[in-house]
Amino acid sequence: MPPLTESEFLALADAELGRIERTVERAADEVDADIEIGRVGNVLTLEFDDGSKIIINSQTPMQELWVAARAGGFHFRRNDGRWVDTRSGEELYVALSRYVSQQSEVDVTLVAD
């Protein structure tokens, strides 16, 4: 599969960041987790009660979404319509569910809309 153009990637990444934002907001409401969600441009920040954060941003030159969490730094690349970890192959929402659960201390399952 050829790489996307820069504008194609930016549109795809922007849509995915919006989807993540909506998904986290909905899941947090369902389990009464207190997560502050903020977005500025291509950076989505999730802040938890203990002050810890998860930061998700798009990296256009690499055509990846990068996630910084207490568990570490992770790179996700689009593959067959899904964002997968470039090292482990884990799907983005599975990984984010674990990171959000760890940092919120509430069992959170994220399912993309």
From Swiss-Prot:
Keywords: Iron, Metal-binding. GO terms for molecular function: ferric iron binding; ferrous iron binding. The keyword Metal-binding applies. GO terms for cellular component: cytosol. GO terms for biological process: iron-sulfur cluster assembly. InterPro entries: CyaY, Frataxin/CyaY, Frataxin/CyaY_sf, Frataxin_CS. CDD domains: Frataxin. It holds the Pfam family Frataxin_Cyay. Belongs to the frataxin family. HAMAP family: CyaY. NCBIfam families: FeS_CyaY. Involved in iron-sulfur (Fe-S) cluster assembly. May act as a regulator of Fe-S biogenesis. This is Iron-sulfur cluster assembly protein CyaY. It comes from Ralstonia nicotianae (strain ATCC BAA-1114 / GMI1000) (Ralstonia solanacearum).
